[in-house]
Every structure is written in structure tokens, then in C-alpha cells.
Amino acid sequence: MSSAPDLALTARLVQLLQTGNIFTTILSIFGIALSAVAAWGIATCVYNLYFHPLASYPGPFLWRASSLPWKIALLKGTMHHDLMRFHETYGPELRLKPDELSYANAQAWKDIHAHVPGRPEFLKDPIRLPLAPNGVMSILVSDTKNHARFRSLFGHAFSDKGLRTQQKTINTYADQFMEVLKEVADNGKSVEMVNYYNMAVFDTIGALAFGESFNSMRDRKIHPWVDAIHKNLKSVAISHVMRSMGIEPLTPYILPKELRGARANNYSYAIAKINNRMQKTGEQGDFWDRVIVKSGAEGEMNDGSGMSKGEMLNNAAVMVVGGSETSASALCGATYLLAQSPDKMKKAVGEIRGKFKSSDEITLHSVTNMEYLTAVIDETLRMYPSVPGQPPRVVPKGGATVCGKFVPEETRVGVSHIGTYFASYNFTRSHEFIPERHIDKSLFPDDNYAAYQPWSVGVRNCIGKNLAYAELRLILAKTLWHYDITLDREKTGDFLDQKIWSIWAKRELWMKISLAENAK
């Protein structure tokens, strides 16, 4: 049976139609529809604010009422600025949108990311991180069982033994980078270091991931795949907002012209590289040696323990982003922060030049125990984490306890790197670059070091952590041994004031470089 409001609405429409004024009728229908939408929106906001299961969590009024402010921030690439401000204002537990909570403490890392026997895993949000265009999983987007399989297959490449195998390759490209910088040193002009670091790291990951360089340093220009990666990630952010609104099919029509086809371009580079790699026989000393043994070059031997061809493709794309952009960002951040703090730069340079008499002495192994250099990297990752836009996890069926409170199933939850590391209740003088805090913990006894997890925790933590640390230490050590570096403040501005779409949209970093006396 129809309700009284339905009958009244129908009667009103019939009355309008009987007047014969079609234009007035259309306007009236539009007005009624608009009023209904407005009423629905107001009712939804009231529910979200006062009756939703997450209503007790603090957060900014408009963000608790509607997901619209969140979507706008995501599209603008300014979410990290909001998280930093909100967590400082509202504390370590924050309601970021009606169905999402953001945390800024150590306990949340354990409750959300750590393995708990008998409890289902908090999987990554499938709306924020959908499957690749071919519909196949990767180490980044997979269920628990398949993630373990991918992790096992790539585990050898990122082990200590694998790192020793890759040492010669990484050293070779670090030395090539020193030669490239020599061309622009002492010319009286500033050098844009983002491009140079990208070239060095991208060539290195090319050799490690596919057995061949991208030849960026040889050609003295950025490979187009780097641009495709950034455009793809920006288009993914737009697609996510459209997907959350149920109108993802409209995405191609909404995307700016320069972003259309970005995802396809990104995967086309991966397809070409992985196909070329699979044609090579014998061990190449790269990430794929064990995968191919288990799977065959075309995935034809995959019995459930290897990978299909589609999985190889998706993982290749993930490895390039994870192994290049993140390390390049850390190198840029460390160089900028050191140049901003001459006393810290002096300490880092003193440690490096005091230990090594020649560049040949600087190897992956010899830089392992560089105390101050490692502290510089750790403090850089606190102030400028390589993956600032970490996707949230989804609370499993039945709900779970996070930070001592029950959280309903399907709620999005996550730990904000930026929100955590800049919160004054977690780190003393949190906006200052102080590498010493990672050497002498008594310097700031109230600092919450357990909340500092730039590589994440649990079974899905960064598989390339050891490789990244080794590469960062090596390239920074060689660069600071060979060159005196000062910041061109006028051309650079505030380098850390950047937007993010999953990774940093890095602004230009201008440095003046001169060959050090010990390198002449």
C-alpha cells in the first residue's frame, strides 16, 4: 500500500499537470526533487553526527557530517596537511569521515596491522585500492593467502643474501650518478636535484627489477615512465572519488585531458619490460630469478606456488613505483633537510669523509653502520615519509577492538604517518629536523618511538626495507663524500610544502654543487 506522503505527492503532480502549464509543472517537479534531495542530505548529516556508530569519535564538524570535505581534500592532494592539523587538535583518535577513523599512536599500528592469531586480517580498502586493469592481484592488492605467496616468491630477492647479490649493480649505478653530477658541479649554476635523483634511482630499479637499466643517466633525461607513474596515481585518486559515489564509469569524461589514458600508459611500460625480461635465460641477479623458476617465463608452470603472467605484470608495475619513487623522495628530503641545517650537514659530512679515504671504500657493506647517516635517514622519514598517503584498512566481519574501543565491521581505519610524526604529544619539537633523537633516546625521553613506523608493521610491511636503507645510505654517502652542497633557497622555497596523491608530487629542489677537496 502507498503511504500518505506518496499519495499526497502523486495528487500534487496530477494537479500540476491538469493546469496545462508544462513549464511550471517541470519547474515544480524539479523543485520537489531538489527539496527531497536536500531533505535526504540533511537527514544523512544529522544521522552521521548524532546516531552513527562512530558518532562519539572527535573530528571536525563538516568531516564527521559528510564525506564531501574528505573527497575535496583527496582531489586537491592536501589530505596530509589536514591530517597533521586535525590530529594535533583532536588527538590520536580522529573521525576523518563518517565511516573512517584515523589514528596517531603506537597501539593502532599493533591493532590494525599486526597479525593476531584467530582474528581475520584487516585488508586494504578495495575502493581505495582496486585491482589492476587486468583484474588480477598483486603484492599490493591481494587477499591474505595470495599476499603470502607473492611475499614468499619475492622474499629471496630482498633478503640479506639477495642484497649481497645485488651489491655490485647498486654500486655501479651509484658511481655512474657521481659522474653525472660531476658535469654540473662548479659551473656556478643551481642544479635541480629531483630530476637527478629520479634518474639514478630509476636506472637502479630498472636493473634490479628487469635486468636492464632505463638509461636515464646515459641519456641525461627522465624516462617517460616516471611521468606516467605520477599521472596514473593522480588519476587513481579521481577514480576513487568517482567510485565511492557510484559513478566510476563517468571517470574518463571527468579526468583532465593530460590524465586520460595514464593508467594504460603506466601498464604499457610494465608490459614491455616484463615481456623483455621473460625472454632472458639463466639467472640475471634481479627480482625475477626465483619467480621464473617457480612459474616459467609465461606463467605456464604455475601450480599455485608461482605466478601467472598477469600477476607478474602487476607486480612489475608495483615494484617500479615502490622501488623508485619512494627512494628518490627520501633522497630529496634528506638532501633538503641537511642543506636547511648546516650544523647537521657538517656532522653528516664529517662522519662520511672521516671514515672513507676514497670513493671506492664506500660500498653497501661499508655504510651499514654509519650511525649519524642512518639517523639522518630515519629523521627524514619522520618528517617526509616516502609513502605519506597510506591507504586505510577495512575492519573485518564481526568488528574488532582498536585502541581499546570496539569498531564496527566495514569501518575504514588507518594510521596517519604525517599526523603521527608531527603530533606534539608523540615527538618533542616535532617540526624540527633533529637526527640525534634517533641516536640518543634520552635526548627526548617523552618521544613515542613505538609510533614511528615508516615501513609499516606486520605481514604487509615494506618488503624492500633493507634494500631501500642500503640504497639510501650508499647514494647519500657517495654524494656527500664527493660534493659540497648548498641550498638555493630563492629558487626552491619550502620543498616540504607539497601535494600528495599516494606519493609526493615533488616540487623542484635547487642545489649548488661543488666538488669537495677530498674528491679532487
From Swiss-Prot:
InterPro entries: Cyt_P450, Cyt_P450_CS, Cyt_P450_E_grp-I, Cyt_P450_sf, Cytochrome_P450_monoxygenase. Glycans are attached at residues 266, 426. It is a single-pass membrane protein. It comes from the Eukaryota. The keyword Oxidoreductase applies. GO terms for molecular function: heme binding; iron ion binding; monooxygenase activity; versicolorin B desaturase activity. Induction: Expression is positively regulated by the dothistromin-specific transcription factor aflR. The chain crosses the membrane at residues 22-42. GO terms for biological process: biosynthetic process. Pathway: Mycotoxin biosynthesis. It is found in: Membrane. One of its GO terms (cellular component) is membrane. Belongs to the cytochrome P450 family. Versicolorin B desaturase; part of the fragmented gene cluster that mediates the biosynthesis of dothistromin (DOTH), a polyketide toxin very similar in structure to the aflatoxin precursor, versicolorin B. The first step of the pathway is the conversion of acetate to norsolorinic acid (NOR) and requires the fatty acid synthase subunits hexA and hexB, as well as the polyketide synthase pksA. PksA combines a hexanoyl starter unit and 7 malonyl-CoA extender units to synthesize the precursor NOR. This is Versicolorin B desaturase. The gene is verB.
